[in-house]
Amino acid sequence: MTHHSLKHISDRIKQALNQIENRNLAQDLWYILGEQNFQGFLPAFTVNHFCEKYHMTDKELALILLPVSACYANPTISHFSVGAIAKGESGNFYFGANQEFCTTNIQQTVHAEQSAISHAWMRRESKITEITVNYTPCGHCRQFMNELNSAETLRIHLPHSQDNLLHHYLPDAFGPHNLQIDNRLFDKKAHNLFLITEDPLIQAALDAANQSHAPYSKTYSGIALQLQDQQIFQGSYAENAAFNPSLPPLQTALNYLLLNGNEVENIARAVLVEQPFRLSYRGMTEELLAYLGDIPLDYIQVS
């Protein structure tokens, strides 16, 4: 799979930082991102440090960071890079970017807002308070964000318009409340799926399944990917009241892997743990893994 690998993420970020007018800020960002191996993430204390040092708000910093976030995009179909920054209740910044996969179906795509939000979710953020994105969110992403436990108060910032509530973009919205669902995306889960295993990859996939948000189908599903250097990345299924904007577990894991500065070519193993009540992501997962490089899938069904 040729996946944007013509340029390493560090080369793309260096190019984006060259566009920042404040050269000292650009140098500081380069140092911080380099120190953390180009993980697309800034902890709250770093965000606060930059804001104090350069006399700017976190909203202004997020807007400046959008071209950097867009460096993580893999727009192999659209050739159109979108960057997003999700700000958590913790004050952390989580980068996101669109992830596209050629030769498979277009439903495998991850949108930038989904990317930033699921990135925050995998890092165990409790709530998203703000989303900054370089283009107006599409209808798919507006609906995806409406599943959040912060949907009613979520603020969206664009280069040309800031501080708009999500419901400014999605008035009279259909959402979880229409289906009598109270537990929202980012709320704590208690699915109590159980396996006896000493394999850390299987345990990670089980943990991801137990964190999954699937109140409509009750198909709890989670995946874990192990790289050649033994790093493990989890992905949980994020279901949506409107069904189609749901984010499959593999997409969540691949996105998390990519936003951590890694490459899909380094995946060595994959385990999917699932309680397939009304659905199953096995086939879709196997299809995308085959495209990524014939990665075998260990599938474990739990009940």
Curated annotation (Swiss-Prot):
Annotated EC: 3.5.4.5
Cofactor note: Binds 1 zinc ion.
CMP/dCMP-type deaminase domain: residues covered: 57-172, 196-303
Any one GO molecular-function label of the UniProt entry: zinc ion binding
Residue numbers binding Zn(2+): 111, 138, 141
GO biological process, one term: cytidine deamination
SUPFAM superfamilies attached to this UniProt entry: Cytidine deaminase-like (SSF53927)
Cofactor(s) required, per the database record: Zn(2+)
The protein's role, per its UniProt record: This enzyme scavenges exogenous and endogenous cytidine and 2'-deoxycytidine for UMP synthesis.
Name listed for the protein in its UniProt record: Cytidine deaminase
